[in-house]
Amino acid sequence: MTNALLSIAVLLFSMLSLAQAETHTFNWTTGWDYRNVDGLKSRPVITCNGQFPWPDITVNKGDRVQIYLTNGMNNTNTSMHFHGLFQNGTASMDGVPFLTQCPIAPGSTMLYNFTVDYNVGTYWYHSHTDGQYEDGMKGLFIIKDDSFPYDYDEELSLSLSEWYHDLVTDLTKSFMSVYNPTGAEPIPQNLIVNNTMNLTWEVQPDTTYLLRIVNVGGFVSQYFWIEDHEMTVVEIDGITTEKNVTDMLYITVAQRYTVLVHTKNDTDKNFAIMQKFDDTMLDVIPSDLQLNATSYMVYNKTAALPTQNYVDSIDNFLDDFYLQPYEKEAIYGEPDHVITVDVVMDNLKNGVNYAFFNNITYTAPKVPTLMTVLSSGDQANNSEIYGSNTHTFILEKDEIVEIVLNNQDTGTHPFHLHGHAFQTIQRDRTYDDALGEVPHSFDPDNHPAFPEYPMRRDTLYVRPQSNFVIRFKADNPGVWFFHCHIEWHLLQGLGLVLVEDPFGIQDAHSQQLSENHLEVCQSCSVATEGNAAANTLDLTDLTGENVQHAFIPTGFTKKGIIAMTFSCFAGILGIITIAIYGMMDMEDATEKVIRDLHVDPEVLLNEVDENEERQVNEDRHSTEKHQFLTKAKRFF
């Protein structure tokens, strides 16, 4: 009887929750317009219904979201990804072209339709096409829930970013070029916050603010602090944490921090809100680049605005690895599936610099990977059908997955996993090449003890020449991207694909393609069945698939050996010739030159007469040359 009453109570609660859930419908059309975001240069930006910036979305847990996204740009495809949302049962809504959907062609409309059942906190959305979010196609996505454990009076969101004066498409042409063989990333012109510079935040005294801080940039990590104010971290990447007080945050692109800031009682003074480039990520620092950006926390509008606030060190920022989740989840046990990848940046045979996981640079297939899953039947668990250059791994249902990432590069990289918040169980220190240190890969037999209750998040950075280890449970069937969130590196191919429980995807009604999906694919002429090469007859035949450029051959090719042989032979002959002529009497040498080269003696004599005086005047120290000319005249 008790169990029956409990079941009825749970059912009634579920029905009540459904009744309270709302549906939020948005009709958005992309376009182009000019904006002067940083006050220095007007440039094209991607607009939403003719407006800029794009709107933030705020919903409650359990709500349904419907976004009709129409591509109003006539010169490019587009898409939309909801960063950090798990998309349980709706992997086709994850918004990654050629992974979970077809690109949205000019004039086409795609419906993103999903329920936010498993996420709360701070997220964001952005285009997942050709770096478009650096041109402004992005906004925050906030999911509220009554169960949030901390009290506050008011809240504010801050979107941090770098800003370029040029379009990403123009920057990409010079970045992905033989004239940029080292892969040096384009340098931004400024740091901005909430799509402007010198933001003013008016505050009330003795008030607790919930501050949502999101780095929506595509390249540079930022240091963030507020002059003479502490920040209490209470959430990262949608995961509520135990309180942790800090003076400074280090925020990579795509990461989110939610903090509590309590204001002072005294209103006589205003304070600086500071952003600073992580300038170690810049290959060069232009002389006119301002590494700091200052906004204003204003208590008193009649008081002077603050100047820049300088700190003694930027090394004392919060290390997110040691944060404790509010709802503790014990570390997963020994993994069932270990994926080890090495990060390398290198050039291919076309002379362009690319990024690699284990010597594979991600190259999009001809059929979106999710559609290959849905159309491949009992071969869906064969990773080969997804393409040679998609770097696809098959994950079985509910297995514990460990990703070991070894960074062979000298830069910092923030990595994002779609569809999951992972446990962060290891992150090693920086190994500085300037000090002669070499890349250090994870050693499973020699590492610090793993945390009992690891921090969870969806975006984690790896330090230079270092490593990290993450774990998650494969309990969310779908096709999920794991990639560097530096947009330049994603354009270079730094990504891999996880096909999680492929047969579970096939069996779920909610995972099937909608008519709208198929219409979008038809509009851009992308196949919706078959393997990575769009072959529907033999899924193991990848003839015609998209592949990366060839590697530069190691050592010498046959042509190189032949060229080197003839070069050496020519060089040896040259040395012998110089030696022979050098040992001969000058008069005999002159005779030999005339005889061997079939020179007309009178022509040579005329040349000697005309140039003798000029040669002597230009080089009085060339005694041997003067003697040669004199002997030549005597000879004739």
Curated annotation (Swiss-Prot):
Record's keyword terms, sorted: Cell membrane, Copper, Glycoprotein, Ion transport, Iron, Iron transport, Membrane, Metal-binding, Oxidoreductase, Repeat, Signal, Transmembrane, Transmembrane helix, Transport
Cofactor note: Binds 4 Cu cations per monomer.
GO cellular component: endoplasmic reticulum; fungal-type vacuole; high-affinity iron permease complex; plasma membrane
Residues annotated as binding Cu cation 1: 81, 416
Binding site for Cu cation 3: 128, 418, 483
Membrane topology, Cytoplasmic segments: 585-636
Documented EC number(s): 1.16.3.1, 1.16.3.4
InterPro entries membership: Cu-oxidase-like_N, Cu-oxidase_2nd, Cu-oxidase_C, Cu-oxidase_fam, Cu_oxidase_CS, Cu_oxidase_Cu_BS, Cupredoxin, CuRO_2_Fet3-like
Transmembrane segments: 560-584
Cell compartment(s), UniProt: Cell membrane
Induction / repression: By iron deprivation. Repressed by iron excess.
Domain of life: Eukaryota
Broad class of where this protein is predominantly found: membrane
Known glycosylation sites: 27, 74, 77, 88, 113, 194, 198, 244, 265, 292, 300, 359, 381
Binding-site list for Cu cation 4: 413, 484, 489
Summary of the function given for this chain in its UniProt record: Iron transport multicopper ferroxidase required for Fe(2+) ion high affinity uptake. Required to oxidize Fe(2+) to Fe(3+), which is then transported into the cell via the ferric iron permease FTR1. Essential component of copper-dependent iron transport. Also has cuprous oxidase activity.
Family label: Belongs to the multicopper oxidase family.
Record's protein name: Iron transport multicopper oxidase FET3
Species: Saccharomyces cerevisiae (strain ATCC 204508 / S288c) (Baker's yeast)
Gene transcribed to yield this protein: FET3
